[in-house]
C-alpha cells in the first residue's frame, strides 16, 4: 500500500513552534512528513542549511515518520524525487492565504500535486522565523518561540 507522504518545504531559519505545530498536525493526515529545507544562495540566513537540518533532525530523532532533508531547485521537482503525495503549508493570516493559494495553483499546474493548507494555531500565529531572527540579533531569549526542547546551536 502506498504511503501518504507530506512534503513541508521552507527555509525554517530558525524552526519555530509554529512549524512544529504544522508537522504534528500533518501527521494526523499523512503517514510521513518530510521537512525540506530549501537552499537559496541569494538569501541571507542566520543558520546554514546543514545546521538547520542537524537542529531539526536532532529534535525529531525519535520520530521515524518525520524526515529532514535539504534541497535546492523547485519544490515541485522535489515532490517527484521524494514520492510525496502532497505539499503542506501553514497559514497565519489572510495575506498568507492569498500568497499560498497562488503558489498552490502554480504547483498544481506544474506537477499536479495538491497543497494542503493548515491554519496555524491562533496561539502561535504571531510567531515567524523573521521575528525570531530579529530577536536573536538583539540578544533576546527566544525559547518561548521554539518547540519545547529545541536547541539552537
UniProtKB/Swiss-Prot annotation:
GO terms for molecular function: ATP binding; pantetheine-phosphate adenylyltransferase activity. ATP binds at residues 11-12, 19, 90-92, 100, 124-130. The record marks 19 as: Transition state stabilizer. Pfam families: CTP_transf_like (PF01467). It catalyses: (R)-4'-phosphopantetheine + ATP + H(+) = 3'-dephospho-CoA + diphosphate. The keyword Nucleotide-binding applies. Its cofactor is Mg(2+). Substrate binds at residues 11, 43, 75, 89. The keyword Nucleotide-binding applies. Homohexamer. Reversibly transfers an adenylyl group from ATP to 4'-phosphopantetheine, yielding dephospho-CoA (dPCoA) and pyrophosphate. This is Phosphopantetheine adenylyltransferase. It comes from Porphyromonas gingivalis (strain ATCC BAA-308 / W83).
